[in-house]
A protein has these predicted regions:
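Membrane-embedded transmembrane helical bundles of large multi-pass transporters/channels
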Residues: 2-184
């Protein structure tokens, strides 16, 4: 018997096994995110808006990789749970701050803007440092690691933007007529 082994064959097997688990991995990460959001907010909007936002961030991230013509490998599969895990943090902080400001005003848009204003510096610094850390992979001699760094950096930026813009827009759109329950 003869055995053939090469890096290309091993990479192919690893990629195939990983792709088969992609759906399960994303579903598990999403379920963990939903559980954390439910514990944090205990209402449908508090859970649904960040989930929508993070899924849009993932669509943008993987779409960006596709537009660049980047070959989808096992490392890119790991982008989804990492972006979900990092992005949920932005959503939780913003929604907590929004809830505090919502108790002081009937204007939903004003409450969201105050929340964003209060957290703009700390969240921006968190995003910048995280993106810089992921972009450090660009100096790697291994092309898949460079691609992984680009994907994660772009994913974090997308998660931040969708958390600040999309979640805010959803709150303004679907809470416009509501008055804060604690102010009634």
């Amino acid at each position: 018997t003869y055995a053939v082994a090469s890096l290309d064959l091993m990479s192919y097997d690893i990629d195939q096994g990983t792709f088969e688990n992609l759906t399960l991995l994303i579903l598990f990460a999403t379920m963990v995110v939903i559980a954390l959001l439910f514990v944090a907010f205990r209402n449908v909007k508090g859970v649904l808006f960040p989930v929508i936002s993070l899924n849009v961030a993932l669509i943008f991230t993987y779409g960006f990789l596709n537009i660049l013509g980047i070959k989808f490998t096992a490392l890119e599969v790991a982008v989804a749970p990492l972006v979900l895990g990092l992005g949920i943090d932005y959503a939780i902080h913003l929604q907590r701050s929004f809830a505090c400001h919502r108790n002081n005003t009937d204007d939903v848009a004003e409450a969201w803007m105050r929340a964003c204003g209060k957290l703009s510096v700390p969240l921006s610094l968190a995003v910048v440092t995280t993106v810089a850390a992921f972009l450090a992979n660009l100096v790697s001699p291994l092309p898949p690691l460079s691609t992984f760094g680009i994907a994660l950096a772009f994913g974090v930026i997308c998660a931040f933007l969708t958390s600040t813009l999309l979640i805010g827009a959803l709150h303004v759109t679907f809470n416009a007529g509501a008055i804060s329950t604690e102010r009634k």
